[in-house]
A protein has these predicted regions:
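A short SAM/SAH-binding and catalytic strip from SAM-dependent methyltransferases
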Residues: 131-144
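C-terminal alpha-helical "lid/dimerization" subdomain adjacent to the S-adenosyl-L-methionine
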Residues: 18-21, 25, 165-229
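Conserved class I S-adenosyl-L-methionine
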Residues: 2-59, 73-77, 100, 177, ...
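Helix-to-beta-strand junctions that scaffold the AdoMet/dcAdoMet cofactor pocket
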Residues: 83, 142-143, 156-157
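C-terminal lobe and adjacent flexible extensions of AdoMet/dcAdoMet transferase-like proteins
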Residues: 236-242
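A short glycine-rich, Lys/Arg-flanked "PGG" loop and its adjoining helix->strand segment in the class I
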Residues: 146-158
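Class I SAM-dependent methyltransferase SAM/SAH-binding core
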Residues: 63-122
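A short acidic, Gly/Pro-enriched loop at the edge of an enzyme's catalytic core
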Residues: 121-133
Length: 242
């Protein structure tokens, strides 16, 4: 039943200790016990993914890299567009999640999709360049997220697309045209998410905007499951390599 599956997920998110000597071990410790029930709960928890992936142009014969792509559920949001791509890579450090992704690709018959267990700050596609790089609620879980963005910049072709959807908190004094978050939002969500090693940052968007030409930006909020009184801030960013 969905309720009991949710309770198992919430146990792992809120109470189960996260152990490991490095980031890969901590990721597997966190996700290993919830991998089977991951997609249904995250579909309700992580908003904006479907809209982001459907909005991005699918270049014919192109290379798409989904960094921190986990179970590969994001790729389903490409719909028929996946068949237009030459190669899709889902890169993650959790082998439990990648196993589900590999099974998903096999079931759909997506022979051009491949899972890669690797570090998002270092891995590069064997083709040498990518047309699209996406991060879906993964930047906040990458300790060196600056390095992950710089790695994406290196692998993208000139004019290539980067697209990010994630939690965030706004700066106290944001740049002109960006949303300002109040004291509660700026001081509640960072420690709230930090218990799961998720770190919403006021610096994601300014850094992305400094490194890429902004194509589209949406700043919004949504209600989390079982937390009806609070709305969590998130953003969708699409940029182009300058």
């Amino acid at each position: 039943m969905p309720f009991f599956s949710d309770m198992k997920i919430l146990y792992h998110m809120l109470f189960k200790p996260v152990r490991g000597d490095d980031h890969a071990q901590r990721m597997e410790s966190f996700y290993g016990g919830q991998a089977k029930n991951y997609d249904d709960f995250r579909r309700r928890l992580l908003r904006g993914r479907e809209e982001l992936y459907r909005e991005i142009e699918k270049p014919a014969g192109g290379v798409w890299v989904d960094m921190g792509g986990g179970t590969g559920a994001n790729i389903e949001n490409l719909a028929d567009g996946i068949g237009e791509l030459g190669k899709v890579y889902v890169v993650d450090l959790s082998e439990s999640l990648l196993k589900i992704a590999a099974d998903r690709f096999s079931q759909h018959g997506w022979n051009n999709a491949e899972t890669i267990c690797a570090d998002a700050t270092k891995w590069q596609p064997p083709e040498g360049q990518a047309d699209v790089v996406t991060f879906s609620y993964s930047l906040t879980m990458i300790p060196d997220w600056f390095g992950a963005i710089e790695n994406a910049l290196r692998m993208l072709k000139p004019g290539g697309t980067i697209a990010v959807v994630d939690f965030y908190v706004g700066r106290k004094y944001p740049p002109t045209g960006m949303k300002q978050h109040g004291w509660l939002a700026r001081n509640l969500w960072v420690p709230w998410f930090a218990t799961d090693n998720v770190f919403p940052s006021p610096d994601h968007l300014p850094f992305l905007r400094s490194r890429f030409e902004q194509v589209d930006l949406v700043e919004d909020r949504f209600r989390m499951p079982y937390v009806p009184l609070l709305k969590t801030p998130y953003y969708r960013f699409i940029g182009r390599k300058k």
